[in-house]
Structures are given as structure tokens and as C-alpha cells.
């Protein structure tokens, strides 16, 4: 079992004599990208007036995202096509600088003779797809398989499809593919429902298709709600009533967070484990109100892949401004957070530091917080972007001139005006949607200060305390938090969806079809309970809730549960195992299987338990 990337890496290893260096981490790939960026200006001297070359972390991250998109869609084909770069970049909806940077990146990665120096994330897929497209005689290098099974076809992109299509054409194995067009949510990475809708059928006319209409995750109540929402057949034979609750929140500060807390506490009172409950956000700015409410209720939580709001770049920047103005960095206890604040200050002040200079500054200030003042005086005020550093200097002077009792929220709002935060976000983040999320995060941070009604020193101290809570080592009694886009393929007993409002979900800056798919993914992560938290005002509610037709499908779902309960079921004979990591290969070789959801090894019911006696868990 392999991902397409792993498969491509294996095929290339059999074709190439040398082994390319592996850019195994984001840090290594960013360093490689910065090396390539140095060639963009010299190799494009006639475009110096339109190039926007920046070295800060946000710019490099956005470049790597655009590079991945170009490779996934095979729109950065090797050798170029003679197209004018300005025209090509505009047509591909990427900044000209990033397009030219991508060309230099690939020239640095692969020389004129085809020697590959390095490979990072997705590069094996891209390299193999390019080779198969340009050199048909390489098709025979693909392994001869009798059976090919592909899951998650809704995530497929042009490069991956090229490999799968060639593999099937060359050796003509039996093929089984599984995908759900309603789960296409990664269009920014080249995913497209066209592959499921007609591309596969066009390439393989004899391929039979079957509907994905049965769910084994949740019961009929949620199945029929999703059937109504997506206008497609969905059925569940589980004898399970998946509860769906609506908990509208009032139009007042903290109300949505309070409803989330009540939903979590009710789940706990029902005797359910907190770590089986996950709060899913449309995007990360929504977590601010919820994290604050959980902290206030003393409910421990942990984020899965997203950062706590106190660790996001725009909030770290404001925290850095406060620390400089107050001369108070000791409330930031974590050296890692101090280093992150330095990087955020360098990014938002547009300080042109080399990676080595930035690394040294981060290490120094993480060790000795008092040196933050020297960073402000010696770097931000001296070499930062002239306009940006002037605005930041005025903001710091303003903060230093405030009375100690001045309210923190008013001070932060004034700082955002001084630095022109909305314009700054739009300048740093190319895509309007990403800039809007940054702006909303900042607004949420200011709202937090307003709700606490504290002065600047007290608010700074509160942030330090809150960060310790958010960063505490989680125990088992821990609620989970993440963004919807990060949890596709996962499932949770209880899913809570807050802020189901107009303008939030669906988001007007995204295509409606992909927003529908994202909501579908969010709701269908739930197994036994789904809690929807919309605005109390019907005019502000997300239209997605009405489309679920919860009242209209209720009787049918009740009847289906009764029907499913009446069906006799065989007693499941599978037994869980208690296996140390060192013994996993042993039980696997005996036929044990791994339950990804429950994170436990088990013996299927058709196997004899005797060989597993030493690992049997208590029934």
C-alpha cells in the first residue's frame, strides 16, 4: 500500500543511477527555495521594476503553495513552452515573481542534462509524470501489476492521474477506484471532480461506475440530511440514531463560545469521553472565541494540525509590538514562542534579513528576552521597509505614551490603524481569502481584549497565562480542535460546527460548490452526534442548515433506525489486542489488523485467537 508519491519515488529509484538529496522537511525546502530566489533578479533584468522579491517566511510559504499547484496541474512543464512569462503567470493565477521563481527553482533542482539534485514534497510525482508525458519509451519502466486499487480519487490531480492512467494503459491490470465527487475540497492543489465525472471514463470507456450511496459511519438521521443537502441517494443500515442538535447563539460577545462549552459539557455529562469530541472550524479565525470560552470553562483542549490563535503570525506580531512598547518580554515564557514572535515582527515589518541573520536573531532573543529592544532599534528601525518601519515606530511611540490604565482593546485597535493592518495583510498575503482570515484573526484578538476589559500590562500577563493553558501537555480528557479542510478521512463520535452563519460558511470569497463540499465533509465526520451552532437570527444563518431538511427527513430516519434494529446481526467476534510497538510486525504477520480510528490492533472474527493469546486485551 503506497501513496502515489511513494509509488513514484520507487519507480524513479529503479530508473535513476544517482540518489537525489531529499528535501524532507519544510525548512529544507524553504532554504532551497531561497537559494533559487537569488537567481530570479539576475536572470530577469528587464523585469526588475515588476518583481516583488521578498524573503520572509510568509512569502516563501506562499511560493511553495503556488509551486505545488503548478506541479500538481502540470502547468509548469519541463523546458517551458516559449510562452511569455507575464501572460503565463496571469493565466495560471499566480504572481509573476512566483512564476519566475518556480522556473529558477526547477533549474536549480534539475540541470540541463536531466540530473536531479534534490526532491521535496510531491516532486517524485511531478518528475515521473513529466517523464511519462515527454518520453513514451519510459512507460515500460512502470511495474506490471495485476490489480491496482486507488482510494481517495477525489483528491487526484493532473500529475497523479498521468501516472495512474499510464500504469493502467501499459499493463492493463484490473482496476478499482473509489472517490466521492462531493469531497473535492483541494482545488487549489489541482483536485477536480472532472476526473471522477468524465476524465476516467474518457480514458477507459469500458470502466464500470457504481454509486457511493451507503455510509457505515453514521446512522440514517445524518445520512438522510446529507442526502437532502447534496441531492443524491445516501443510505445507512446502521441501527444507530446519530443525534443532530441545533444550538443557536445570541448576537452578543462570547455567545457562540458559550454554546460550544455547553455542548461539550453535555457530552461529558452523558458519560462520553472528551477526546471523542471535535470542534471543527471553517477556518482558523473562528477558534479565538471558542478557545477563550474553553479556557474560561477550564476545559482542556488541543489543536490537531492548526495552531492555537496565540501562535498565529498576525497575533505574534501584535504580541511583539506590545512586548517592545511595554519593555516586557518575560510573560512569553516559551523560547519557541519568543523566536516565533521575532520572525513575525520581521515579516510584518518587512525586514530583509537573510535566513542566517533571522536564525541568529531568533536564537539570541529566545535565549535573552531583553535583546528584543536591540532587534527593534537595530533591525526594524534601521533596515525594515521604510514605510512599514515608520508606521511601526509611530505605533510603538503611541503605546509607550499611553497611561497605564488605558484599555488594551483601544490600544490594539489604534496600533492596527497605525500599521494599516488590513492593507498590510493584503500586501503580505497574495490571495484575498487568506488576507481576510488574517484580518478576522486580528479583529477577534481585539474583541478578546475588549471582553476582558483589561489594561495593557494586565492583558499582556493574561496572554502569558493563556498560552500556558493552550500549550499544556494534553491528557485524555481533552477536546479536539481543527479546521475542516484538515480532517478529511477522519471521524469523530461528536462533531461541533460553530459559526454557521452567512458570510462564514459558505464563505463568499470561495466558490459555492467547494464550500458545499467542505460543509459535506465537516458534517459527515460525525458518528453519533452532530451539533450545529448558527446565529439565532434566521436572516444570519447559513443556508446550508435549511438544505439539510432536518424536520422533513426525521420520520423517515426514525423508521429506518427501527428497521435496522429489527435486522438480526451476527455477533462480532473480533478481539482487541494490547500490542507494544516492538511486536506490531509479529501480530501483523499472524493476520491482525490495525483499526485506524480506534488506534488499536485487533483479530478479525474469522481467525483463531490462540496464536494471539499473549496479546489479547481484556474483553
Regions found by a protein language model. Give the residues of each.
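Conserved RecA-like helicase ATPase core segment
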Residues: 158-246, 549
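Accessory N-terminal region flanking or inserted into the helicase ATPase core
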Residues: 45-149, 158-160, 194
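Helicase P-loop NTPase motor core
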Residues: 205-209, 213-301
Amino acid at each position: 500500500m503506497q501513496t502515489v508519491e511513494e509509488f513514484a519515488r520507487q519507480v524513479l529509484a529503479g530508473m535513476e543511477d544517482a540518489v537525489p538529496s531529499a528535501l524532507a522537511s519544510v525548512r529544507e525546502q524553504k532554504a532551497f527555495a531561497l537559494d533559487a530566489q537569488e537567481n530570479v533578479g539576475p536572470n530577469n533584468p528587464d523585469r526588475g521594476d515588476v518583481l516583488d522579491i521578498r524573503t520572509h517566511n510568509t512569502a516563501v510559504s506562499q511560493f511553495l503553495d503556488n509551486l505545488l499547484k503548478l506541479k500538481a496541474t502540470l502547468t509548469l512543464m519541463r523546458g517551458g513552452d516559449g510562452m511569455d512569462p507575464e501572460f503565463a503567470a496571469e493565466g495560471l493565477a499566480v504572481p509573476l515573481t512566483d512564476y519566475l521563481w518556480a522556473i529558477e527553482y526547477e533549474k536549480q533542482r534539475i540541470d540541463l542534462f536531466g540530473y536531479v539534485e534534490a526532491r521535496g514534497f510531491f516532486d517524485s510525482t511531478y518528475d515521473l509524470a513529466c517523464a511519462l508525458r515527454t518520453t513514451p519509451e519510459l512507460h515500460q519502466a512502470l511495474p506490471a501489476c495485476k490489480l491496482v486499487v486507488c482510494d481517495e480519487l477525489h483528491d487526484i490531480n493532473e500529475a497523479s492521474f498521468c501516472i495512474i492512467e499510464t500504469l493502467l494503459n501499459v499493463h492493463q491490470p484490473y482496476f478499482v477506484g473509489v472517490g466521492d465527487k462531493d469531497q473535492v475540497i483541494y482545488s487549489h492543489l489541482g483536485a477536480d471532480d472532472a476526473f471522477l465525472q468524465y476524465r476516467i471514463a474518457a480514458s477507459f470507456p469500458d470502466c464500470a461506475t457504481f454509486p457511493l450511496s451507503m455510509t457505515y459511519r453514521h446512522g440514517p438521521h445524518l445520512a438522510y440530511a446529507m442526502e437532502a443537502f447534496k441531492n443524491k441517494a445516501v443510505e445507512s443500515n446502521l441501527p444507530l440514531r446519530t443525534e443532530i442538535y441545533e444550538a443557536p447563539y445570541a448576537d452578543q460577545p462570547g455567545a457562540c463560545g458559550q454554546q460550544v462549552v455547553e455542548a461539550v459539557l453535555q457530552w461529558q455529562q452523558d458519560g462520553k469521553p472528551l477526546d471523542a469530541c471535535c470542534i471543527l472550524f471553517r477556518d482558523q479565525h473562528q477558534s479565538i472565541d471558542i478557545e477563550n470560552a474553553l479556557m474560561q470553562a477550564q476545559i482542556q483542549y488541543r489543536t490537531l494540525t492548526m495552531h492555537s490563535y496565540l501562535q498565529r503570525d498576525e497575533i505574534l506580531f501584535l504580541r511583539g509590538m506590545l512586548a517592545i512598547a511595554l519593555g516586557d518580554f518575560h510573560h512569553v515564557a516559551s523560547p519557541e514562542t519568543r523566536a516565533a514572535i521575532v520572525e513575525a515582527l520581521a515579516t510584518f515589518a518587512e525586514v530583509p534579513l537573510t535566513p542566517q541573520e533571522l536564525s541568529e536573531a531568533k536564537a539570541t532573543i529566545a535565549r535573552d528576552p531583553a535583546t528584543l529592544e536591540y532587534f527593534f532599534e537595530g533591525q526594524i528601525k534601521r533596515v525594515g521597509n521604510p514605510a512599514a518601519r515608520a508606521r511601526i515606530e509611530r505605533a510603538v511611540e503611541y503605546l509607550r505614551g499611553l497611561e497605564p490604565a488605558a484599555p488594551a482593546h483601544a490600544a490594539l485597535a489604534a496600533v492596527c490603524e497605525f500599521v494599516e493592518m488590513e492593507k498590510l495583510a493584503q500586501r503580505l498575503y497574495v490571495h484575498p481569502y487568506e488576507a481576510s482570515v488574517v484580518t478576522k484573526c486580528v479583529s477577534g484578538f481585539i474583541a478578546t481584549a475588549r471582553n476582558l476589559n483589561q489594561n495593557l500590562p494586565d492583558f499582556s500577563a493574561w496572554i502569558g497565562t493563556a498560552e500556558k493553558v493552550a500549550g499544556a501537555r494534553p491528557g485524555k480528557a481533552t477536546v479536539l480542535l481543527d479546521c475542516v479542510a484538515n480532517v478529511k478521512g477522519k471521524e469523530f463520535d461528536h462533531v461541533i460546527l460553530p459559526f454557521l452563519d452567512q458570510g462564514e460558511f459558505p464563505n463568499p470569497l470561495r466558490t459555492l460548490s467547494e464550500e458545499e463540499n467542505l460543509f459535506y465533509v465537516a458534517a459527515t465526520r460525525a458518528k453519533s452526534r452532530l451539533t450545529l451552532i448558527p446565529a439565532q437570527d434566521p436572516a444570519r444563518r447559513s443556508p446550508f442548515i435549511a438544505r439539510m431538511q432536518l424536520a422533513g427527513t426525521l420520520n423517515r430516519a426514525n423508521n429506518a433506525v427501527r428497521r435496522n434494529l429489527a435486522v438480526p446481526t451476527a455477533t462480532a467476534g473480533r478481539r482487541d489486542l494490547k500490542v507494544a510497538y516492538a511486536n506490531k510486525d509479529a501480530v501483523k504477520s499472524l493476520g491482525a489488523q490495525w483499526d485506524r480510528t480506534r488506534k488499536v490492533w485487533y483479530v478479525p472474527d474469522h481467525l483463531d485467537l490462540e496464536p494471539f493469546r499473549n496479546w489479547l486485551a481484556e474483553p
